Amino acid sequence: MSKTIAILAPGAMGSAVARRLNENGARVLTSLKGRSEATQKRAADAGMIGAEDEAIADADIILSIVPPGEAVALAERLAALIVKREKKPIVVDCNAVNVDTVQRIEEIIGSAQAPFVDGGIIGFPPQPGGKSPAFYMSGEYAGDVAVLRDFGLDVRIVEGPVGAASALKMSYAGIVKGLAGIGSAMVVAATKAGAADALRDELALSQPAILARLEVALPDMLPKAYRWVAEMREISGFLGADHPASQIYEGFARWFEHLAADAKGEAVDAELLKAFSTGIAQKKS
């Protein structure tokens, strides 16, 4: 039986998820009000249908897939739409937000008497013919969205309340993106001090797995750095203000903010990171 699923918004992940759902028989709606021509084309290419707010609110399931800094505002917008509907959609927050934030979002959606699921996406946007990222779901209604498996998504239920899936996402991202933060900061510092080749050679000898990861992670992170700023602050909040390590992630937020601005400007540090990554590949050949 087909389902109508609304995805807000049609970014890189949202549109790729929409394509996967559409390929497996779901009807996928999105909001295109005020969106750029490029975004509208991306949505159309993914088989998404532009819809008014009323139609969005009538979907069976709504997936919120936006930058973490926009998650609460979107929840408030959705609650204002849903509260007027007799039939309530299941709202799933799939964003990289901490436990406190997702519990706040649960309260907002709950004020509209709609069922809410805490979600966390781990993995890359699905490519045609490729595997789905993992969609971890928790909360009372998590089992109700397991139906998304029938439409091509890898849904994994976390036995726990709202907050459990987000805690998993925060912990995983804190490790994986934290390594990207540490690696990129040290590579730039080493390069500016004339030690790039020596660092690369030593990592190849003693830490080959880390070097292999940096080869991919350094160039891959640059176009995403702006999105990671708010995520690092969410991770800092997940640890808590009194946790000694929380300032590490606040520092990563500032570092990724710098890299995002650098990549858009003179790209000094961005080019150093790309050069280091290219050097890894050249050493292997």
What do the predicted segments below correspond to?
Residues 1-58:
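NAD(P)+-binding Rossmann beta1-loop-alpha1 motif at the extreme N-terminus of oxidoreductases
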Residues 168-269:
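Helical "substrate-binding/catalytic lid" subdomain
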Residues 5, 97-177:
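Rossmann-fold dinucleotide-binding core
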Residues 27, 47-49, 90, 115, ...:
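Conserved beta-strand segments of alpha/beta enzyme cores
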Residues 51-92, 97:
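Rossmann-like NAD(P)-binding element
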Residues 267-285:
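Short, basic/aromatic-enriched C-terminal tail that caps enzymatic domains
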